[in-house]
Amino acid sequence: MSDLDDRAGLDHVVDHWLSLDEAAERLGVTPSRVRQLSREHQLVVLRPPGGRGLAVPAELILDGQVVKGLGGTLTVLSDRGLSDVESLEWLFTADSSLPGRPIDALRENRGREVRRRAQVIV
């Protein structure tokens, strides 16, 4: 499956995307800093399905900051072999063991619980 095919599934889990400029504005940084945060696995930046430019799922930003615990969670998911697309699918898909979506648990400051779930992904 191509990366484009992989991204098509994100339409069903990510409701709202921010352009790079919008994400930068919400974070109070430059677009190049947003790209750097992505390279550092602190944030996910990619081309959304049907999108023309790079974008960030809006729910990864809360109160002008990257959601607390997101970076550590993305690192764990990457270490388990998940791509950025797969990581977003996991974050935005309900998990009955939490309960709810991992992104919601992170937004509720339950990062440790989310990372424990991420560590057992095979």
Name each region found by the language model:
Residues 1-122:
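Non-transmembrane "mature" sequence context
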